[in-house]
Amino acid sequence: MPLFLILCLLQGSSFALPQKRPHPRWLWEGSLPSRTHLRAMGTLRPSSPLCWREESSFAAPNSLKGSRLVSGEPGGAVTIQCHYAPSSVNRHQRKYWCRLGPPRWICQTIVSTNQYTHHRYRDRVALTDFPQRGLFVVRLSQLSPDDIGCYLCGIGSENNMLFLSMNLTISAGPASTLPTATPAAGELTMRSYGTASPVANRWTPGTTQTLGQGTAWDTVASTPGTSKTTASAEGRRTPGATRPAAPGTGSWAEGSVKAPAPIPESPPSKSRSMSNTTEGVWEGTRSSVTNRARASKDRREMTTTKADRPREDIEGVRIALDAAKKVLGTIGPPALVSETLAWEILPQATPVSKQQSQGSIGETTPAAGMWTLGTPAADVWILGTPAADVWTSMEAASGEGSAAGDLDAATGDRGPQATLSQTPAVGPWGPPGKESSVKRTFPEDESSSRTLAPVSTMLALFMLMALVLLQRKLWRRRTSQEAERVTLIQMTHFLEVNPQADQLPHVERKMLQDDSLPAGASLTAPERNPGP
């Protein structure tokens, strides 16, 4: 009986579901020199319904930080930031951006720092690395519904080392564009991230877009998404298309000029906007705001297209020269812009402090009775309470500010403030002449070594031939010297074997003298007797 129970228990354990074991190639979080830091395995959870990947719970200095959700529009572009620890190992590592599936466990490389770009993403994807700042940025343009999916940005020689997963979504609505007609003298275009709350007089996540022309303004109640309101000269309410927004994503979606546009829902108040060339008085009730603008004839264009700004290669911002085109990725306050009221993009790439980047959302100051809304180190707007009723536009050109000021702040730590980040990278990143000089030794760089291999082989052959010729020459010279020496020895031996007469011994010399004939003797031959 006990044996039967044991067999039943063993059989039941064999039918139990096997526990999922981690894949061996996911055990390493990063390619550290000592290979001693193992990755702490987490649970499988989706960052979105489309992206299932094991998230890293490894909080070591090699962990990556960035946005988990990226949203864009069809035909637009998105910019993705991946922060990493600026250590000596990570600076020289390969940076990559890949797409998961199909199958789901394979991540196909789209672009990497080894000068590799997938053929399907040519001319519309770029990866820029900033080793000194611990950041690399990926920009994908010409978005389409086919780009929806899960992506990984990571560091390492393979696509399964140190990575961060994210989900890319494309909104269903079309991209918003400015009207094709030339703006009139009294037109003012404003777009903003965030919606106005009439109760607390503060901003909540969302996007409010307001297009106004003429002297009368109508508004639409603020919604958590993106609302668009157009006001005509007759003062009728014309609500535009509404599209969803993804607050707190930490990435940028390119659109038109964006600026804070508060929607007054409080008791009647008056606001005043002052600039060098235009003066507007804003009078509002619960449902309407009146805008009156006066401008001279030579300053009839009042839209914030920023066409008169100098282009800075350091920021890579494309500015549309025509009002009908989209102005890419601009975040700033509304202003009655003229030729003398142009924003300047500072040519520095110095990161701002985290406190400065967090100041991009308006906060209520009870002592002063005012709240401030601005972007990091760029433009600061001060909006007075109904008692003050004054808008003051000023530009804070701080020495530490730049369009890329919030790149060093971790996107995942900012939450909804990430929607107020600075202008995305459209062109080359970083100051000119300071490009990355990182040495890379990866499979894509083997072409240079293959080119140098034949040259080194030829040099080795030439050296070998020279050594052989030199050895033969030395051998011939040595052989000739030995031949001369042998000849000299033979001649000396011959002279010793055949001595002269004066060198013979005394007895032999006497015998030779005795055998010689006397001086008077002569030899005579006998005469023959001739016969008869």
Curated annotation (Swiss-Prot):
Keywords: Adaptive immunity, Cell membrane, Disulfide bond, Glycoprotein, Immunity, Immunoglobulin domain, Membrane, Receptor, Signal, Transmembrane, Transmembrane helix
Segments forming domain Ig-like V-type: 61-169
Record's bilayer topology term: Single-pass type I membrane protein
Annotated region (Mediates immunoglobulin Fc fragment-binding), positions in chain: 75-97
UniProt keyword Cell membrane present: yes
Post-translational modification: N-glycosylated.
Matches recorded under PROSITE patterns: IG_LIKE
Transmembrane regions listed in the UniProt entry: 451-471
InterPro entries linked: CD300_family_receptors (IPR050671), Ig-like_dom (IPR007110), Ig-like_dom_sf (IPR036179), Ig-like_fold (IPR013783), Ig_sub (IPR003599), Ig_V-set (IPR013106)
Glycosylation sites recorded in the entry for this protein: N167
Annotated Low complexity bias: 204-215, 397-410
Source organism, top-level taxon: Eukaryota
Gene3D superfamilies, per database record: Immunoglobulins
An annotated GO BP: adaptive immune response
UniProt GO cellular component terms: plasma membrane
Expression induction: Up-regulated by IFNG/IFN-gamma in mesangial cells.
Protein's cellular compartments: Cell membrane
Main subcellular location of this protein, as a coarse class: membrane
GO MF term list: transmembrane signaling receptor activity
Subunit (UniProt): Interacts with IGHM; this interaction facilitates the endocytosis of IgM-coated microbes or IgM-antigen immune complexes.
The protein's role, per its UniProt record: Functions as a receptor for the Fc fragment of IgA and IgM. Binds IgA and IgM with high affinity and mediates their endocytosis. May function in the immune response to microbes mediated by IgA and IgM.
Protein name: High affinity immunoglobulin alpha and immunoglobulin mu Fc receptor
Organism lineage string: Eukaryota, Metazoa, Chordata, Craniata, Vertebrata
Gene giving rise to this polypeptide: FCAMR
